[in-house]
């Protein structure tokens, strides 16, 4: 009787073991299979992150005496950064840039394109999507060169079209230029995501709303937006993080003129590389990572609260 009970008790354990090892590899061989991926993650993600955190606690510089004898300064770099008016100016400019070119610009423009093209014939829609996607897939360095040629004060295409020779758009309106530039570059992602989301909206619901007398705006507000709410949140989160971390505007304005386009990524680069303060730049990078985490957690909290 006792042996029967023992055998019965052991059966579930063996079943659980088989369920946990469906491939029959065993823990050692399974670990060997994932070892290359874990090694790559450790080398290119984990180690640089830990090294950056360490550098942020030191006075490491690229040149000078501190380059040969690095001191441990603890949170000194962080305190110096938080007391630096240039940091807060850069952060305010970054928030404005993200709000105008990302949250509002790319999201609204992407949704408008997706909404307006949903009834267009197949070939025309494919052509429009290809044109919009071209701005997204072309490398940022190439796009920046094209925009510099467009806005050049001497022989620029825009000045030629508007008959305004000598107009220095990059100097007179630098923030507006990088906002429009970022909208132009990133709208394709929002358009594709919203196009996919709109295709999932049941046509019967829109038809019922139309027959009930709902206007186009009412259909959008009461039927479409509640249905694609999750896609809207995902798009806004992705666009916010990408725009917050983008470095491409530097290729247009180099943060100028007079720090007027010095967003956080540019500020970190100027501090760490041309400025030679690698420890301070690492501390800024950690602060930027913390801000990204706060943004992501805030969006996740909003998403859970609306379920």
Question: What does each model-found stretch correspond to?
Answer:
Residues 1-25:
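Short, Lys/Arg-rich, polar N-terminal cytosolic tail immediately upstream
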Residues 26-307:
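A structural signal for multi-pass alpha-helical bundles of membrane permease subunits
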């Amino acid at each position: 009787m006792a042996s029967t009970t023992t055998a019965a008790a052991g059966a579930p354990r063996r079943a659980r073991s088989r369920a946990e090892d469906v491939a029959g590899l065993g823990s050692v061989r399974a670990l060997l299979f994932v070892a290359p991926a874990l090694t790559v993650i450790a080398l290119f993600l984990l180690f640089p992150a830990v090294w950056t955190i360490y550098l942020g606690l030191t006075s490491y510089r690229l040149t000078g005496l501190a380059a040969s004898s690095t001191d441990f300064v603890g949170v000194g770099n962080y305190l110096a950064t938080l007391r630096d008016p240039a940091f807060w100016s850069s952060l305010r400019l970054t928030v404005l840039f993200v709000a105008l070119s990302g949250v509002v610009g790319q999201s609204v423009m992407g949704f408008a394109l997706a909404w307006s093209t949903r009834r267009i014939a197949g070939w025309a829609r494919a052509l429009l999507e290809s044109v919009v996607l071209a701005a997204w897939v072309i490398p940022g360095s190439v796009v920046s060169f094209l925009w510099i040629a467009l806005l050049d004060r001497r022989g620029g295409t825009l000045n030629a079209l508007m008959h305004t020779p000598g107009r220095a758009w990059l100097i007179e309106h630098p923030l507006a230029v990088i906002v429009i530039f970022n909208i132009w570059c990133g709208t394709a992602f929002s358009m594709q995501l919203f196009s996919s989301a709109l295709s999932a909206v049941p046509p019967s619901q829109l038809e019922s709303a139309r027959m009930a007398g709902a206007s186009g705006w009412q259909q959008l507000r009461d039927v479409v937006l509640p249905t694609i709410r999750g896609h809207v949140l995902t798009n806004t989160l992705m666009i916010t993080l990408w725009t917050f971390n983008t470095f491409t505007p530097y290729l247009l304005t180099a943060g100028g003129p007079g720090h007027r386009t010095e967003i956080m990524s540019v500020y970190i680069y100027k501090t760490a590389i041309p400025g030679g303060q690698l420890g301070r730049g690492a501390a800024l990078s950690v602060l930027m990572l913390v801000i990204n985490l706060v943004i992501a957690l805030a969006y996740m909290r909003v998403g859970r609260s609306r379920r």
